[in-house]
């Protein structure tokens, strides 16, 4: 989905590119590659970006499948940092950390001060994780068994979990101090932690 910030529309595309448009006119302001195709087969060349760009503090954070975590500077209109990683979801900025749920359901965290890897976790490997959100200072995501997991973003340690549904959790989002979970059967749950 497009993200609107300061009269600009930020969109990531199936071809692995980020584009920024003027909201009023639709005029393309700038674009850049999140990652480049590097394989020899169609499957290896799949670099789809289904995640929403995250726009914060003059920077745009993007991810794509079989690609990169990439940070673009909106003033310079170019990538200023990237890291090889595969993800279906938008990265999360929380408590000075940049966190990515990888496509294999492992987690990777980077310090926002140094952009060096802070911690990684394979505790949820191949559990078909949902997107992650920051909520009340914690990182929260769902899994294929209908659980939500609560993680301390500073060290990656699981501090809680709760069974929400018997179906896999597909999406988590927060609005107005509430946490919402959508499962594979399109059931919506409102959670207060």
Predicted feature locations:
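Structural signature of WD-repeat beta-propellers
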Residues: 6, 13-14, 57, 64-65, ...
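Structural recognition of beta-strand segments within beta-rich domains
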Residues: 11, 62-66, 70-72
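Short loop/turn segments that connect beta-strands within beta-propeller blades
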Residues: 22-26, 73-76, 111-115, 152-156, ...
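C-terminal closing repeat unit and adjoining cap/tail of repeat-based domains
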Residues: 114, 138, 143-187, 193
């Amino acid at each position: 989905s497009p993200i609107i910030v300061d009269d600009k529309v930020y969109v990531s595309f199936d071809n692995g590119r980020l584009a920024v448009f003027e909201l009023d006119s639709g005029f393309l302001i700038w674009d850049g590659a999140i990652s480049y195709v590097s394989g020899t087969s169609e499957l290896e060349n799949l670099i789809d970006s289904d995640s929403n760009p995250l726009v914060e503090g003059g920077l745009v954070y993007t991810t794509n499948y079989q690609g990169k975590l990439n940070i673009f500077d909106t003033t310079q209109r170019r990538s200023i940092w990237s890291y090889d990683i595969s993800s279906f979801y938008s990265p999360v900025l929380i408590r000075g950390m940049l966190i990515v749920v990888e496509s294999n359901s492992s987690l990777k965290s980077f310090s926002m001060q140094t952009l060096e890897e802070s911690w990684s976790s394979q505790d949820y490997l191949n559990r078909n994780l949902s997107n992650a959100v920051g909520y009340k200072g914690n990182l929260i995501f769902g899994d294929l068994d209908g659980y939500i997991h609560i993680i301390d973003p500073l060290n990656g340690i699981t501090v809680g979990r709760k069974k929400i549904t018997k179906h896999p959790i597909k999406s988590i989002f927060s609005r107005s101090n509430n946490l919402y979970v959508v499962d594979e059967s399109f059931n919506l749950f409102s959670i207060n932690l």
